[in-house]
Amino acid sequence: MKPECGQTMFRTFWSRSRDSSAMDPPLQSEEDSQTQPSLPSPLTSYRWHTGGSGEKAAGGFRWGRFAGWGRALSHQEPMVNSQPAPRSLFRRVLSAPPKESRSNRLRFSKTLWGRHKNVAPLEPKPNPKAPEPELELVADPDLPVAQIPEPPTPDMPVWNIDGFTLLEGKLVMLGEEEGPRQIRVGSASSENSMQAALGNLKDAVRTPGKTEPEAAGSNQVHNVRKLLKRLKEKKRAKSELGAYTPRDGPPSALGSRESLATLSELDLGAERDVRVWPLHPSLLGEPYCFQVTWAGGSLCFSCRSSAERDRWIEDLRRQFQPSQDNVERQEMWLTVWVHEAKGLPRATVPGVRAELWLDGALLARTAPRAGPGQLFWAERFHFEALPPARRLSLRLRSAGPAGATVGRVVLELDEVSIPRAPAAGLERWFPVLGAPAGAVLRARIRVRCLRVLPSERYKELAEFLTFHYARLCGALEPALSAQAKEELAAAMVRVLRATGRAQALVTDLGTAELARCGGREALLFRENTLATKAIDEYMKLVAQEYLQDTLGQVVRCLCASTEDCEVDPSKCPTPELPKHQARLRDSCEEVFENIIHSYNCFPAELGSVFSSWREACKARGSEALGPRLVCASLFLRLLCPAILAPSLFGLAPEHPAPGPARTLTLIAKVIQNLANCAPFGEKEAYMAFMNSFLEDHGPAMQHFLDQVATVDADTTPSGYQGSGDLALQLAVLHVQLCTIFAELDQKTQDSLEPLPTILRAIEEGRPVPVSVPMRLPRISTQVQSSFFSGEKPGFLAPRDLPKHTPLISKSQSLRSFQGAGSWASRRPDEERPQRRPRPVLRTQSVPARRPTHRRPSAGSKPRPKGSLRMGPAPCGRAWTRASASLPRKPSVPWQRQMDQPGDRYQTTGTHRPVGKLAEIQCEVAIFREAQKALSLLVESLSTQVQALKEQQEHFRCQLQDLYSRLGAGISKLDSKGGLPSNGSHRLKSLEQRLTEMECSQDQLRDSLQSLQLLSKTPGSRSQPLPLKAPCVNGADLSMGT
């Protein structure tokens, strides 16, 4: 045998020995992993033989190890547990070192769920990348155990969440897998991942028709040829599996399935210590990832946007924390700005990065920076819903493979979270421990500790914001700083998006901004107003996936490019200028083509807002401002800022280098001028060569602006799709409003009642003593005064409450009902018969299915395994590609109570307090009496109007008769050719009588008008006015003639 073959075999084989003295000394990590006792297992006696330090057997090192391996095979110890026929020892060649117990894995296979639930887990694996002991903090017995799970390793497999759905509390893979997906080759630091991948690979490479070898015999021990042949076959099979899909995309796009090739479902309710945690993009190199950890392992999933990730985290957390909205909890928000460091040793390539550790848990890391002297990062990290912590550590570590620690900054969070800390956070130069003298790190830390109450305590606050956000914004606009406006607008948008009013908020604020600017289009969305900040936050929420699809790929290519596009003659050599101009024009062409062809994936919610703005401009008579309003919001506040700073919008993992950053700046200038229809002038004369580009693509840009502002009749904007922790968002809003109202003048506070009263009640922990008016249509004052002694006010001061109804608010009745249990059995007099469900008929296009049974709302009968719940929509939902357009159940907690199974078929009107029954009966009696009085008044008015109509008809007939007689007399006189001697006297008499008749007609018209006004005024029954002069029937005419 050749020495090379022997060396390969010695580094590959596992040995199993009874005598521990014959084995190599265990590594330090193995000693640490065995600190806790564990149940005996036959796998604990396996050791990995490498070329490390150990005893050399007689006859040379290599052959001595080979002899030791043979001695281990000849001295087999009996198995502790009864096992089936022993497997071939050669089959353990490609297995990972010690096998995991099945209960220690995620229970992937369907056959594993009903079995092996009582198997004791093995010892946890040691962390392959342990921090340096000399820089570790001293253990503090009072320090709380970090609730943040351990971060994944960079080579940990990431699953695409599009291939999963949440059904009945189980995370289920969509479809059946024929075999393992593509294997992503990584380092050997993730032993669990490689073990699962290789363990699943052995079944895929098995040749059809070939049975598994029987138990190992004595002749297999020395048969090295067969062993090497099996090694080559499995290596070839692995390479064939990885040769079908190109490796040029991110792991999630390639459908990574390393560790979970046989995944079927994960029951969150059956696992212990389940936690769902969002991951910073710097940990895995992918944006919008989250991690699911449990007592036996962890998984990482990637999403398409932050809204999709937040929605999945919410749905998963509600599976094992169903009462999250009904309990009080403490949470923390942490924001860290890592600016720069100086005084450190020279940072060679690949550079030095800063890592954020919170109570021993890694949160994020910066991009590496190399070079002599000062290192500049300027990165911002924001974390929400963190568990309470005490200590923040910023560790400067080398970005190389060794990862040597350069120094650290330790900060007690009590210094930052005290009430006297500045609102913007604590910013200063922190000394770096473990580094040369004079090394400092400039950072800014802001910590906010929040007391999150049950969501029902914020009910009145959410109602006030939902119905009176315009009044609130108008009153607070002049009194807030730019930072306060940004924070308040973000909190309002998140809360109103949960209640379904965010689109109306943005539409109304945009219309108000248009009225405030007064037609000065140059000021639209260019100032620090609540409207501008709210629109920024709303577009980031609804258009994040749109940004990824439109600009993600092209911006990442530009960030990775090394081509220079500088066109300023003062910064570029003259011979290179034409080439740079051509590159810039091509890059602008590519970006512009991606934008104008992105209409199909444009968010429908944003299109509806733009359409409403254009309608408002048209109603104001300034229709030309409609495209300017759309352009100022879409390009000035979203697309061009995303091109300028791609890392802030999730388009790039870090801020681009100076060269690509200059290219992105020039492209953003061109796109913004193209949207504004503004050519480059004398201020930027070096960009004048792009004016022809602006002229050529101007019509296409205007067509795109018209497209995005047109609402498709077949497309309905989707509802809420973001994070659902409404209690946390309302707690943030409550803290912000309390801070604002503490410095607000009393006149403004009085104008915003009942909001100050609501804030004080929530702060003091007592029931809210007021109700929020809901903008319901008001009854006419005259009709209301007929049966009400006085109008009931929408807001009552606490001192005036005894004068009106008893103090029973809506939130108090809701809390009393929920405190008794929403699924508690009702009294016999309150029970209502349940409605029978309407049978659903199958259409011809849907295939026949097995009939399902409805789950009863109460009872101890368990639901059959695998059956679907027929009650309200579950917290999880089937996932499809178009996730942003899926409908969603109400995320407002007090509306979600209506969807609980126990209350689905029960009447919601039986929860009113019994103490108000007598008052309600009195009000009903008053309403009935008032209704009877109104009925009698209407009947009398109808009779009077009918009599007046008859009198008017009689007068009209008399007037027509008089006109006919007058015409006959005049015609008779004309036929005789002259008038009699006394004709002049008679003519004057006729004219006088005609004048009297006209006066009578005017008097009759006035009477009719007074009767019509009388019919609208209840309680007045006046008779028609008598005529001042008797009616003349014209008898004198016949006598005169």
Swiss-Prot record:
InterPro entries: C2_dom, C2_domain_sf, Ras_GTPase, RasGAP_CS, RasGAP_dom, Rho_GTPase_activation_prot. SMART domains: RasGAP (SM00323). The record marks R526 as: Arginine finger. Residues 312-430 form the C2 domain. Predominantly expressed in hematopoietic tissues. GO terms for biological process: negative regulation of Ras protein signal transduction; positive regulation of NK T cell proliferation. This is RAS protein activator like-3.
